[in-house]
Amino acid sequence: MSRIARRFAALKAQDRGALIPYLQACDPDYETSLALLRAMPGAGADLIEIGVPFSDPSADGPTIQAAARRGLAAGATMARVLEMVTRFREGDADTPIVLMGYLNPIEAYGPARFCADAARAGVDGLIVVDLPPEEADLLEGPAADHGLDIIRLVAPTTDDTRLPLVCRHASGFIYYVSITGVTGTRTASADELAQALPRLRAATDLPVAIGFGIRTPEQAAAAVRVADAAVVASALIATLEDSLDAEGRAGPDTLKRVLAQLEALGRAVRNART
């Protein structure tokens, strides 16, 4: 059983959902993002998504695009991202790590080499937002060879013909994009989520995480009442950005502010079903 499957099984046994926070690698610098990564499990993270900075993040809104620019300016590369995971694993063997990004950096690295190095570093799953199932052969084989889950995105616009294809090529969990458009732009209503989830449940036995548009503890709690996990990205990145100084450097309270927000989200998720 994979680390992702074990974590979801353990949470299901406790009848609680998962909180999946997101951070952008090397935002605003390598050491700050590593310190944040290391502190996230203690602040309430059940799984963690690490964004791989890319120069053309077309699925992301302005907040995460700005984070990607900061990460690239700080020297982020795929090798540095994997090094960060390796260093995280020195102190945490249990928290699942998912890399989220775009195909271009993986192709530049070499898909087979990337999957081998990612697994060796301690990565558990991959979300490649611009890799449709029809073109996934180049990554699915190497990922399976090294025990990496390929997490698929399902959107409100995914119709009943396409949904089984997407789910058939997925492992780990399904990432339900709760809104149309880019990240961080609006929030799905509870009614919209309640209507969408039964269709997903009928198509897959995998856990379902809801992302894109979850910003507050209340929204995270509402998400895990109908799904298995809530992903929070733009809201945490916005808090980090607000803590930076005029030159874009980490402030004295950067970690404290982001982790306090994460703790509030974690409390809401833990208590959502009680």
UniProtKB/Swiss-Prot annotation:
Cite the entry's keywords alphabetically.
Amino-acid biosynthesis, Aromatic amino acid biosynthesis, Lyase, Tryptophan biosynthesis
Q: Which CDD domains match?
A: Tryptophan_synthase_alpha (cd04724)
In this entry, which stretches build a coiled coil?
Answer: none
Which residues does UniProt mark as catalytic?
49, 60
The metabolic or biological pathway listed in the UniProt record of this protein is:
Amino-acid biosynthesis; L-tryptophan biosynthesis; L-tryptophan from chorismate: step 5/5
Kindly indicate whether the keyword Amino-acid biosynthesis belongs to this entry: yes
Q: Which gene encodes it?
A: trpA
Assigned protein family: Belongs to the TrpA family.
Source organism's superkingdom?
Answer: Bacteria
User: Which reaction(s) does the protein catalyse, per the Swiss-Prot or TrEMBL entry?
Assistant: (1S,2R)-1-C-(indol-3-yl)glycerol 3-phosphate + L-serine = D-glyceraldehyde 3-phosphate + L-tryptophan + H2O
User: Can you name the source organism?
Assistant: Gluconacetobacter diazotrophicus (strain ATCC 49037 / DSM 5601 / CCUG 37298 / CIP 103539 / LMG 7603 / PAl5)
Q: Which Gene3D superfamilies match?
A: Aldolase class I
Instruction: Supply the InterPro entries for this chain.
Output: Aldolase_TIM, RibuloseP-bd_barrel, Trp_synthase_suA
Q: What is the protein name for this chain? A: Tryptophan synthase alpha chain
> Which molecular-function annotation in GO is an example for this chain?
tryptophan synthase activity
Any one Gene Ontology cellular component term annotated for this protein = cytosol
Q: How does it assemble?
A: Tetramer of two alpha and two beta chains.
> Which HAMAP family does the UniProt record give?
Trp_synth_alpha (MF_00131)
Biological function: The alpha subunit is responsible for the aldol cleavage of indoleglycerol phosphate to indole and glyceraldehyde 3-phosphate.
State the EC number(s).
Answer: 4.2.1.20
